[in-house]
Amino acid sequence: MTNIRKSHPLLKIINHSFIDLPAPSNISSWWNFGSLLGICLILQIATGLFLAMHYTSDTTTAFSSVTHICRDVNYGWLIRYLHANGASMFFICLFIHVGRGMYYGSYMSIETWNMGIILLFAVMATAFMGYVLPWGQMSFWGATVITNLLSAIPYIGTTLVEWIWGGFSVDKATLTRFFAFHFILPFIIVALVMVHLLFLHETGSNNPSGLNSDSDKIPFHPYYTIKDILGVLLLLLFLISLVLFTPDLLGDPDNYTPANPLNTPPHIXPEWYFLFAYAILRSIPNKLGGVLALILSILVLALLPHLHTSKLQSLMFRPLTQTLYWILVADLLTLTWIGGQPVEYPFIIIGQLASILYFAIILIFMPMAGMIEDNVLKMD
């Protein structure tokens, strides 16, 4: 008799995706982050659902409803902080996942990579709208500043901004629609994740060497299920430590002040995971130029498959490009630091140099290094 997991129409799909999936025998712990992102998404949807049961998306009651969740709802404080810090974990895993794709040349699976970029944009949009919901000072002013960027679009900009706001400023209509979008987007993300996995399983996983691994495959279960469980336990340990010991470590104190349209906070800064993009935005004096640089800072990832000049896929055997890669990582950390600093000397010039370096490494230096390495290794 055939095993039910191999014959049942639904279980068969799960079996081919998570159980009998042929996986390369040498994929390292950097490949754990895909499953960790799945866990983060499930956690965010679960905690978000319980928060939505008690939250009210009205400007007069939004702030106090969040306070009510933390004070009066059973374990409401835990759910709220798991959700807030879960977002930070989500982005840590996202950045490592993308970074791993860049390092090992996984972007050569173009469909999977492009789907991943769409997912990154969707998660960033969801996180931004979620940050507006508690209706604190930083929520309100963050929403005002970021949505206002769309007014830089020629001709239709102002109309577009007012259409998104549902009025002439960020108000009740804006909050209500942001809540609606914040609720629906994670489910759209789940659908996109399925497409992402569908594309991935068409080609199979990449591996650290960047070489074809068809001749050396092992079943996903039990080898990588056990390996993933270890990753999940470490992630949960880190998240729970953060939630129970320093839940406000990554937040902004300004968000504990109810939104006041008449009082601007001294420094408007987004959550830490957007600071690198915010620094790139601020480093260009022109409004439209800044917005374009902001979008391109993520969209530039879509160019990676077309900028790949080396005959070797992975950076494992390419020391010159490896060096550039780690300079890029340091540059992104610098941008993250600059994004949280006030707009004054020397931070302005550091931000501008770091922004130029970011685009230069990806668009110029890495493709050049690939050609140099091919020459040195006599790959042609």
Swiss-Prot record:
<feature type="transmembrane region" description="Helical">
    <location>
        <begin position="320"/>
        <end position="340"/>
    </location>
</feature>
<feature type="binding site" description="axial binding residue">
    <location>
        <position position="196"/>
    </location>
    <ligand>
        <name>heme b b566</name>
    </ligand>
</feature>
<dbReference type="Pfam" id="PF00033">
    <property type="entry name" value="Cytochrome_B"/>
</dbReference>
<dbReference type="InterPro" id="IPR027387">
    <property type="entry name" value="Cytb/b6-like_sf"/>
</dbReference>
<keyword id="KW-1133">Transmembrane helix</keyword>
<keyword id="KW-0472">Membrane</keyword>
<keyword id="KW-0249">Electron transport</keyword>
<feature type="transmembrane region" description="Helical">
    <location>
        <begin position="347"/>
        <end position="367"/>
    </location>
</feature>
<feature type="transmembrane region" description="Helical">
    <location>
        <begin position="33"/>
        <end position="53"/>
    </location>
</feature>
<keyword id="KW-0349">Heme</keyword>
<comment type="function">
    <text>Component of the ubiquinol-cytochrome c reductase complex (complex III or cytochrome b-c1 complex) that is part of the mitochondrial respiratory chain. The b-c1 complex mediates electron transfer from ubiquinol to cytochrome c. Contributes to the generation of a proton gradient across the mitochondrial membrane that is then used for ATP synthesis.</text>
</comment>
<dbReference type="GO" id="GO:0045275">
    <property type="term" value="C:respiratory chain complex III"/>
</dbReference>
<feature type="binding site" description="axial binding residue">
    <location>
        <position position="83"/>
    </location>
    <ligand>
        <name>heme b b562</name>
    </ligand>
</feature>
<dbReference type="InterPro" id="IPR005798">
    <property type="entry name" value="Cyt_b/b6_C"/>
</dbReference>
<feature type="transmembrane region" description="Helical">
    <location>
        <begin position="77"/>
        <end position="98"/>
    </location>
</feature>
<dbReference type="GO" id="GO:0046872">
    <property type="term" value="F:metal ion binding"/>
</dbReference>
<keyword id="KW-0679">Respiratory chain</keyword>
<feature type="transmembrane region" description="Helical">
    <location>
        <begin position="178"/>
        <end position="198"/>
    </location>
</feature>
<dbReference type="InterPro" id="IPR048260">
    <property type="entry name" value="Cytochrome_b_C_euk/bac"/>
</dbReference>
<feature type="binding site" description="axial binding residue">
    <location>
        <position position="97"/>
    </location>
    <ligand>
        <name>heme b b566</name>
    </ligand>
</feature>
<dbReference type="InterPro" id="IPR048259">
    <property type="entry name" value="Cytochrome_b_N_euk/bac"/>
</dbReference>
<keyword id="KW-0479">Metal-binding</keyword>
<comment type="similarity">
    <text>Belongs to the cytochrome b family.</text>
</comment>
<keyword id="KW-0999">Mitochondrion inner membrane</keyword>
<dbReference type="InterPro" id="IPR036150">
    <property type="entry name" value="Cyt_b/b6_C_sf"/>
</dbReference>
<feature type="transmembrane region" description="Helical">
    <location>
        <begin position="113"/>
        <end position="133"/>
    </location>
</feature>
<feature type="binding site" description="axial binding residue">
    <location>
        <position position="182"/>
    </location>
    <ligand>
        <name>heme b b562</name>
    </ligand>
</feature>
<keyword id="KW-0496">Mitochondrion</keyword>
<keyword id="KW-0830">Ubiquinone</keyword>
<keyword id="KW-0813">Transport</keyword>
<dbReference type="InterPro" id="IPR030689">
    <property type="entry name" value="Cytochrome_b"/>
</dbReference>
<keyword id="KW-0408">Iron</keyword>
<feature type="transmembrane region" description="Helical">
    <location>
        <begin position="226"/>
        <end position="246"/>
    </location>
</feature>
<dbReference type="InterPro" id="IPR005797">
    <property type="entry name" value="Cyt_b/b6_N"/>
</dbReference>
<dbReference type="InterPro" id="IPR016174">
    <property type="entry name" value="Di-haem_cyt_TM"/>
</dbReference>
<protein>
    <recommendedName>
        <fullName>Cytochrome b</fullName>
    </recommendedName>
</protein>
<feature type="transmembrane region" description="Helical">
    <location>
        <begin position="288"/>
        <end position="308"/>
    </location>
</feature>
<comment type="subunit">
    <text>The cytochrome bc1 complex contains 11 subunits: 3 respiratory subunits (MT-CYB, CYC1 and UQCRFS1), 2 core proteins (UQCRC1 and UQCRC2) and 6 low-molecular weight proteins (UQCRH/QCR6, UQCRB/QCR7, UQCRQ/QCR8, UQCR10/QCR9, UQCR11/QCR10 and a cleavage product of UQCRFS1). This cytochrome bc1 complex then forms a dimer.</text>
</comment>
<feature type="binding site">
    <location>
        <position position="201"/>
    </location>
    <ligand>
        <name>a ubiquinone</name>
    </ligand>
</feature>
<dbReference type="GO" id="GO:0006122">
    <property type="term" value="P:mitochondrial electron transport, ubiquinol to cytochrome c"/>
</dbReference>
<dbReference type="GO" id="GO:0005743">
    <property type="term" value="C:mitochondrial inner membrane"/>
</dbReference>
<dbReference type="Pfam" id="PF00032">
    <property type="entry name" value="Cytochrom_B_C"/>
</dbReference>
